[in-house]
A protein has these predicted regions:
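Conserved Walker B
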Residues: 158-162, 174, 190
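Loop/turn-to-beta-strand initiation segments
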Residues: 148-153, 178-184
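Conserved catalytic/switch belt of AAA+ P-loop NTPases
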Residues: 143, 168-179
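Clamp-loader machinery-focused feature within the broader ASCE/P-loop NTPase space
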Residues: 2-161, 165
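Conserved adenine-binding aromatic site and its adjacent loop/helix in ATP-hydrolyzing domains
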Residues: 140, 172, 199
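Charged, glycine-rich active-site and insertion segments that engage polyanionic ligands
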Residues: 1-71, 179-182, 188-295, 299-376
Length: 376
């Protein structure tokens, strides 16, 4: 579409076109659900759409209101997110009243990063739920009258982190919003929202990013070298959040460890495989072990592609290893192993001991040798 500034959100032209049609109709719903994977531009699109709605003329988003929208400044934007619980906090306290000075400083820094880079994923320790007190504050925000902005917004990040009580409290705000008030509920897990919430929102779906778009955003918005961005984007599943998780690792080391663990487990060298995995469990970081499982699954999926004669692999520099694997383990039930590895990844979220999970990873991979070799 001509002059659609929403296309500045890379890789989301379909969502941008839908929102532009809504903008052109001037029939603006009071609530949107932006649904799609983490790290694909949902928050950025909400900000750009609100800028567009408040622009004095189409394509002109340089007004002072637009700047305040970009800065997530109240009373233009109410930004709601998960927060840690403070010491002795009760439902009568405000969302931040009982937080320590250190946590408040961390929150301030994280919000500043989000303002500077709308693709940034806020990471606040202990922030696991959206507090009902945060939802109740929306009523106060709605009661303000402010004529400088034609449209104001409530942006709820990771809306699925509201429990049922918080969602029911939100319903009251959704049912009778004042004129010019828009809600943006942003989540990768829309099915965790109550049907009564979903029925009041206009759903806009967001797609995983294409590799070239993801690489370009990594370069432009995160300052990643192009060569590194191109390599990372291949393994990122179309998500900047996943890409940044990979960037936090030594990526070449991660690939090397993945191959070594597979090689040792398949050779039944349990101690060597366990030693390699121990570097992912030593820090007691569930995220690192989850990442390793994802990399192993990616390699096994590449092996399945090779077996089917497909040529495009994520582990493209190891195509020879994939061929040797399929020659040796032609009867391997890769799908079953991948299914069990996914179960192990989910069990990490249930606080199962990481060392127990590490042993199970090795045993699942070793099972390929027992059942995958073609009999003579």
């Amino acid at each position: 579409m001509r002059n659609n500034i929403l296309h500045s959100v890379k890789g989301q032209n379909a969502a941008g076109d839908l929102l532009y049609k809504i903008y052109s109709s001037q029939k603006i719903p009071h609530a949107f659900l932006f649904s799609g994977p983490d790290g694909v531009g949902k928050h950025f699109m909400a900000v750009k759409f609100l800028e567009l709605l408040n622009s004095p003329s189409e394509g002109n988003t340089s007004s002072s209101v637009a700047l305040k929208v970009r800065n997530l400044s109240e009373p233009f934007v109410k930004f709601v997110m998960a927060l840690p619980r403070g010491k002795n906090e009760t439902g009568d306290n405000s969302p931040t009243e009982k937080l320590s000075s250190e946590t408040l400083e961390e929150l301030k820094e994280e919000l500043e990063k989000k303002v500077r880079n709308p693709y940034y994923k806020i990471n606040l320790q202990g922030a696991n739920n959206i507090k009902i007190s945060s939802i109740r504050e929306i009523k106060k925000f709605q009661s303000l009258t402010y004529e400088e902005a034609k449209y104001r917004a409530v942006i709820i990040s990771d809306a699925h982190l509201m429990n049922d009580e918080a969602q029911n409290a939100l319903l009251k705000s959704l049912e009778e919003p004042p004129e010019g008030m828009i809600f943006f509920l942003i989540t990768p897990f829309k099915n965790e929202l109550l049907p009564t919430i979903l029925s009041r929102c206009w759903t806009v779906n967001f797609d995983p990013l294409k590799r070239e778009d993801l690489s370009e955003i990594l370069t432009d918005s995160f300052g990643v070298e192009k060569q590194v961005a191109d390599k990372i984007s291949v393994f990122s599943n179309g998500s900047l959040t996943h890409a940044n998780t990979l960037l936090d690792q030594d990526f070449d080391f991660l690939i090397e460890k993945t191959i070594n663990i597979l090689r040792n487990a398949l050779a039944l060298k349990y101690q060597s495989a366990l030693k390699d995995i121990s570097s992912f469990t030593a820090s007691s970081s569930a995220g690192e072990l989850t990442l390793l499982i994802e990399m192993i699954i990616t390699w096994l999926n590449d092996a399945s592609k090779n077996k089917l004669g497909l040529q495009e692999y994520l582990f493209s520099s190891h195509s020879g290893t994939l061929e040797k694997f399929n020659l040796k383990f032609s009867r391997a039930a890769i799908d079953e192993v991948v299914f069990k590895l996914n179960d192990l990844a989910h069990s990490i979220d249930n606080n199962l001991n990481l060392n127990v999970i590490a042993l199970n990873i090795i045993f699942e991979l070793a099972s390929i040798r027992y059942f995958g070799i073609k009999s003579a």
